[in-house]
Amino acid sequence: LGYFLFTHFILKKNLIKKNSKIINVASGAHWGVDLDFNDLQMKKNYNGWIAYKKSKLCNILFTKKLSQILKKDDISVNCLHPGFVQTNFGSNNNCIIKLGIRLAMKFGGININEGTETLLYLIETHNKITGEYFYKGKVSPSSNFSMSKINADKLWNKSLEISAKYL
């Protein structure tokens, strides 16, 4: 709910003007999961990796819904997958998982400069493109679940419900 609450606060304070851009970070990790709208916080069956994947799916759905809302104000809202960036991601896992992630990053990851290329691209261009998922500097496909307007609407409404006491 971080993106959801933060964006609501800055919109309430009129800190976002016409022709602005909102760029959210998602991930290719969103593939292969969906959401249980009756248990978004995974209280029944929590798994850290699945929670991460679902949070990135939520970022895409949030981006799609927010882009619909702000389109009339000429505010573009997009999200991106930065790639498998060599960071300390996964350092809070047990030794075996941590080692696996480190090896994967060493041999298949990209450096931080490469990971920021799509972000910089979105900052510099595409004022009129909105509601899209970008990877490697271009609009890329995301999962079928993430493309559903119905799912975006459901997540938006559930997010309003969960965060009502903070808004």
Task: Annotate each PLM feature.
Residues 1-89, 157, 165-167:
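Rossmann-fold NAD(P)H-dependent dehydrogenase/reductase core
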